[in-house]
């Protein structure tokens, strides 16, 4: 981040950076090893372990709209602290689970915590950040997330080698720490929807037809994005016959974002057609995934992963910056929460249908099938966003966050 932008960044946003980094460190240190714990130490099937992860994701994304409406009504700071505290309890509970239902309770609590602090946190970033530097602020948050991913691999490996018990307590303690830090140092962020009931946000979002279409189109983007959690690791293992290389390929994506995200935002600063940029990013992601069908060496896998990461770096800052442009300031968290359905649906379809189509292609000796589908999805996303771009200005809320 440039020094002048850093100077313009409010102290409260810098504190949000700290809490975001700590939470990402805790999340990515625990979740990948939860699957290994369930299938290894506990002896569950992969399908059963996947069900626990699916319950956690649905508990978060499925209730994020409600969490956003609560944040708009009762304040962003208090909602964030409540969500962080609930997730801290959920993550710590994994250390004490001995029966199946214990794990599902811990997963639900973990997800519900996220459904509160995620939309409230995104709205806090948008409200506290001057409009002129909001894209850069969200881009730097994306960088910190990937720094957290890389750091969590080191921390998670070290603690998991001791015992999953300590890893769960560590992850829970990190979220508890962020709750305390936010309580002590984050300034009050007043509720923006003080004159209307919670359900006014519900009605307002559902009547915003352009935003609903935008959210639906983003399902395709997240279908592509979530390939990093299933089909890409599986392809790397199938080609290299060693799980170690999975970490190398995924780290290529994270390190690329860390090194290049801010520079790409700077290069695209003068390009004002934001929806088209999101579409171009999705198209680049689709191309990177499509090229995987030609990869037969580690360096080709890493090159395709780098191309894929370029697409995420083009799209992601624009995606998180678009929501406050649609939303009236009194409903911004509700808009963020509803927009999360694109991730919930796209991620679920990606992991279920994407995994199935990968197996079908493999069994029919049509390895090109899942990757060609990804290219087509990228084309559909860019075409729809290109058509929507011309109508964007008249759809932006006149009372949006400035």
What are these regions (language model features)?
Residues 1-10, 187-217:
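Juxtamembrane intracellular "pre-TM" segments in multi-pass secondary transporters
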Residues 32-47, 230-245:
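Short amphipathic helix-loop junctions that connect adjacent transmembrane helices
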Residues 57-65, 149-150, 254-262, 347-348:
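Residue-level signature of mid-helix packing/kink "hotspots" within the transmembrane helices
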Residues 61-98:
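Conserved MFS/SLC helix-loop-helix module at the cytosolic interface between two early adjacent transmembrane helices
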Residues 64-75, 260-273, 358:
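Helix-to-loop junctions at the C-terminal end of transmembrane segments
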Residues 107-145:
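Cytoplasmic helix-loop-helix junction between adjacent transmembrane helices
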Residues 160-173, 356-377:
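A membrane-interface helix-boundary motif in multi-pass transporters
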Residues 331-362:
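A late C-terminal transmembrane helix in Major Facilitator Superfamily
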């Amino acid at each position: 981040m440039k020094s002048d932008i850093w100077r313009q960044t409010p102290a409260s946003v810098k504190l949000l950076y700290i809490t975001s980094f700590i939470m990402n460190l805790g999340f990515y240190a625990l979740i990948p090893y939860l699957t290994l714990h369930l299938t290894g130490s506990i002896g569950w099937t992969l399908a059963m372990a996947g069900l626990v992860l699916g319950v956690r994701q649905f508990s978060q994304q499925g209730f994020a709209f409600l969490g956003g409406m609560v944040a708009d009504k009762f304040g962003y700071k208090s909602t964030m602290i409540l969500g962080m505290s609930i997730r801290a309890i959920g993550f710590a509970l994994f250390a004490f689970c001995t029966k199946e239902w214990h794990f599902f309770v811990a997963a639900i609590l973990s997800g519900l915590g996220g459904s509160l602090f995620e939309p409230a946190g995104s709205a806090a970033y948008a409200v506290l950040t001057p409009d002129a530097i909001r894209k850069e602020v969200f881009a730097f948050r994306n960088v910190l997330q990937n720094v957290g991913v890389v750091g969590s691999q080191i921390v998670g490996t070290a603690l998991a080698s001791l015992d999953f018990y300590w890893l769960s307590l560590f992850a829970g303690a990190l979220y508890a720490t962020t709750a305390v830090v936010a309580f002590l140092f984050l300034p009050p962020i007043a509720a923006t929807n003080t004159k209307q009931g919670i359900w006014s946000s519900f009605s307002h979002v559902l009547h915003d037809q352009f935003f609903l279409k935008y959210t639906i189109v983003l399902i395709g983007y997240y279908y592509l994005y979530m390939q990093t959690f299933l089909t890409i690791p599986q392809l790397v293992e199938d080609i290299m016959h060693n799980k170690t290389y999975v970490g190398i390929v995924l780290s290529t994506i994270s390190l690329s974002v860390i090194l290049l995200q801010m520079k790409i935002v700077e290069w695209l600063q003068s390009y004002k057609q934001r929806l088209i940029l999101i579409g171009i990013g999705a198209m680049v992601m689709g191309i990177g995934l499509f090229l995987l069908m030609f990869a037969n060496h580690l360096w080709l896998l890493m090159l395709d992963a780098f191309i894929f990461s370029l697409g995420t770096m083009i799209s992601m800052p624009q995606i998180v910056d678009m929501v406050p442009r649609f939303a009236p300031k009194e409903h911004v968290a509700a808009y963020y929460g509803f927009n999360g359905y694109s991730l919930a649906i796209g991620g679920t379809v990606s992991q279920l249908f994407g995994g199935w189509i990968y197996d079908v292609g493999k069994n029919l000796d049509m390895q090109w099938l899942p990757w060609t589908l990804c290219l087509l999805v990228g084309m559909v996303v860019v075409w729809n966003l290109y058509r929507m771009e011309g109508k964007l200005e008249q759809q932006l809320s006149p009372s949006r966050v400035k």
